A protein has these predicted regions:
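Outer-envelope beta-barrel architecture signal
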Residues: 92, 140-144, 181-185, 206
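Glycine- and acidic-residue-rich phosphate-binding/metal-coordinating active-site segment common to enzymes
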Residues: 119-166
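Residues on the lipid-exposed face of transmembrane beta-strands in outer-membrane beta-barrel proteins
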Residues: 130-134, 169-177, 208-214, 237-243
Length: 246
């Protein structure tokens, strides 16, 4: 019986690794197809764009790249860990896969006549990957999250400035206080953009909020269920006040 248990565990982990590998392959294929449909075909000449000040989004796009680098790293690492990898290896593979995927997105943009390679986008991608990797190996009470202003306007692949402006990108901190890990509320500082009355000029916004995520809320009464819902920790349900930055 003692020898059968390790064999059974190895077989289970092998099956899980195949499941994760297959899901990732299908997922990245769908992302590629949707990106090409939304932002245009990558059939032009290689070129670089001024993405820091030239996209009319006042760095909200860079904030989104920070979020996706961070969230992808944590999510993919968790999936490889479920597949049976050691904590260290799952973190390494998750971070490498995230960095590679986000780099390939920028390479696609570099050959897209309507886009272009964004150097600042890449820098924020890699910063997000690094932040995600750091928090996996050094767990704490701060995280990077997102929320939307109007749910009806939400699009994962934003096609217009209006859709991009709908997102708020947050850095949140959850003080444990007297309740410890079951304390569900987080304080957040968020960044977003809206349009001036002319409908064109971007206006930067800072948001100061208090809120929670679904896993943090569920953890107050069902810690085991909260671990299962951990993949949903990226969304910040909040109340906030907004300050315009001129």
């Amino acid at each position: 019986m003692d020898s059968a248990a390790p064999v059974s565990e190895v077989r289970r982990n092998t099956y899980r690794l195949w499941i994760v590998t297959g899901l990732h392959a299908v997922g990245w294929a769908l992302v590629y197809a949707e990106a090409q449909r939304t932002w245009g075909q990558s059939r032009g000449r290689f070129h670089v764009k001024n993405d820091w000040t030239g996209d009319g989004l006042s760095q909200n796009d860079e904030a989104s790249h920070l979020f996706f680098g961070y969230t992808l790293t944590r999510t993919l690492s968790g999936q490889w860990r479920w597949g049976g990898m050691t904590p260290r290896r799952s973190r390494t593979i998750g971070a490498a896969e995230s960095a590679l995927a986000l780099t390939l997105v920028e390479v696609m943009d570099a050959f897209n006549p309507a886009q272009g390679l964004g150097i600042s986008d890449l820098l924020f991608d890699y910063t997000g990957v690094g932040a995600g990797l750091w928090t996996l190996s050094h767990p704490g009470d701060w995280t990077i999250r997102t929320s939307v202003k109007v749910a009806a306007h939400a699009r994962v692949f934003a096609e217009t400035e209006r859709q991009s402006d709908n997102y708020i990108w947050w850095v949140t901190y959850r003080p444990q206080l007297r309740w410890g890990v079951k304390q569900p509320l987080s304080l957040g500082v968020g960044h977003s953009v809206r349009r001036a009355p002319d409908g064109i000029t971007p206006v930067r916004e800072l948001h100061f909020g208090i809120g929670t995520s679904l896993p943090d809320l569920v953890r107050t009464f069902a810690p085991q269920a909260a671990r299962v819902l951990g993949i949903l920790d990226f969304y910040y349900f909040n109340l906030n006040i907004t300050a315009t930055v001129r």
